[in-house]
Amino acid sequence: LGFYLLFVRFEKQDTYIHFLLRRYLMVKKKTERLIPQSDQPKKQISRGKVTVPKNSKQNALSTEKNSLENRKTAKKPTSGKKNSAGQKKQNPQKTKNQNSKTQQKSVQKNGTSRPVKNERKTTKANGNSKGQSKRRGKKNNVPLKIAFLGGLNEVGKNMTLYECGNDMMLVDCGLEFPDTEMLGVDLVIPDFTYVTENASKIRGIVITHGHEDHIGGLAYLLKQVNIPVYGTRLTIGLIEGKLKEHGILKQCSLNVANPGDHIKLGCFDVELIHVNHSIPDAVALAIKSPAGTVIQTGDFKIDTTPIDGGVIDIARLSQLGTEGVLALLSDSTNAAKPGFTESERKVGETFETQFRKANGRRLIVATFASNIHRVQQIIDVAESLGRKVALSGRSLENVVSIAAEMGYIRIPDGILIGIDSINRYPADKLVIITTGSQGEPMSALYRMAFSEHRRVAICPNDYVIISATPIPGNEKMVGKVVDELLKQGAEVVYEKMYDVHVSGHACQEELKIMMSITKPKYFIPVHGEQKHLRKNAGLAKSVGIPPQNILIADNGKEVELTEDKIRISGDVPAGMVFVDGSGVGDVGSVVLRDRKRLAEDGLIIIVATIDKETGDVLSGPEVISRGFVYVRESEQLIDKARRLCDSVIADCMFERVRDWTTVKNRLRDEVSHLMYHETKRSPMILPVIMEI
């Protein structure tokens, strides 16, 4: 009793009690050998006495019967004995075969292969916490490598590569919209060099959700590497539309998986876990490998009242945390914002208030094309107020069409009208949902603001709601659009004025909840600029993750994970690839520099015709200016440049220089020096020499 009271406050008091009892028995019966508790029949302890369970009764009157009964009891547990956890032992080979068969099943539906959801029992059997801790040392002999091809130090272009042994898999393949410095560029996608170099090792790509920064680059990737694609139903539906536009749908392998399903990719087992975001069917990924389990959250938030009723699967994330998580890769977009992210339903309430405020006026609402929940709420409020709804923007029309066809959005009969039909209805009976919430040039709202839209002209009485927050870097473009709308007399409402937008990304408290329930050994912040990543790393420290277990990576870095350490092990190609029209990758930094120079300082073309035999100048040189100076107002400067060109060509002929490249370089250098001296500007100089 004294020893019991001494150890009763310890967390493992049962272990100490059993130890003391065994010591007591050893003293009492010196001739008995102490057998480990797990190898002998479980003993029932009662008031200091040891009694034998009923299944091994002894006959005290017969030594022979006692011996025989003990032998039977010893044989009996081989087929039906329970282990120390109270679970019936199974044949390991049989269990392995059953699990293998379960993982290999698939259902053919609508021409796609959908992996069948593994039973949670199988997951528990494979994830026993004691067994896992014992096996972890063996598993982690093989390191897990994670290469970041995009998504770090930027918002967009998300792409991650996992490598373990001879197997690789990808997560997401997004795009990034160009900034104002990228003249003439339509899209920016990741560099696929490392993927194409290791194409034979890539087992597949898993997509977390259907936003452009996660699926926008997929069509360009699949043109170079034909690998299977996995995603939830809506995500695959949106991908199908993109691949159809690129004309490669038939040659691609698209596979639908649901939250809870397991996808086997080489040595990787990928489980999809439902999360909340601003688009339905978003998932986090639990990626199991011989090295351990890594959770990549994707874009997420914790919404307790989501529009579709599907809350984040906290229970499964907690269970994985109990089983053991090697690393957590967490969304960092809102890591600098305290508190919790508002529920999407909050926007619906604001819409109803603002729509009523706009009584008698035409409503124009700009939002992300893929924000199906937002579109649904706009339609619901419009229906309640007796307004018709028109869609403007090709991407918006495509997404709504796909979502309606798949049952993710409800459109009442007769409420949706074509954009060509808006003039048939009174202004106070219309709501126009449009793209362009980020101020993108050539988007529908942009064209409306600058009077370039073929069907919609902004009127002084219009009520415009911009239901989005500018992505970092887009603030100037959004401000430009707002200014133009105001100049035309429209009233503009945006997020800073009213709650017309809530984020789809977790704020600080939600991020800390994710860390607390998953209990990762290592933490890598992803999806954000440097300031977001560092803030998220600070949150990880605040919940108790050791600083040495937190790593802030960068695009092009390869991170190696083992049970003992996390480190940056190397570099991989991970630059920007610019898409300009149908050209992919043919626009580089040099081309962008030239375009910027042309835009800022203009162009000077020098044209001269020279006799091929004698080297005499037959005509010219002519000096032509475009975008540099107005010729009529700068005749003296142009004339000075012409005389300088004459002198340079004459010197070259005198020196018998017949290498026209050398002549062009001299012309370029001399004229460039003159122009900078006279104007402090550096136009592009383009010499053209023709031989006759």
Label each residue range with its predicted role.
Residues 1-25:
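Short, Lys/Arg-enriched N-terminal segments with co-localized hydrophobic residues
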Residues 26-139:
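Intrinsically disordered, low-complexity RNA-associated tracts
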Residues 127-206, 211-425, 443-457, 476-480:
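His/Asp/Glu-rich metal-coordinating catalytic cores
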Residues 152, 176-180, 184-187, 201-202, ...:
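A glycine- and charged-residue-rich anion-binding loop/surface
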Residues 243, 540, 675:
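Conserved hydrophobic residues forming the short capping helix/wall of the S-adenosyl-L-methionine
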Residues 337-467, 471-520, 524-656, 664, ...:
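Hard-cation-handling environments
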Residues 656-692:
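C-terminal tails and terminal domains of large nucleic-acid-associated
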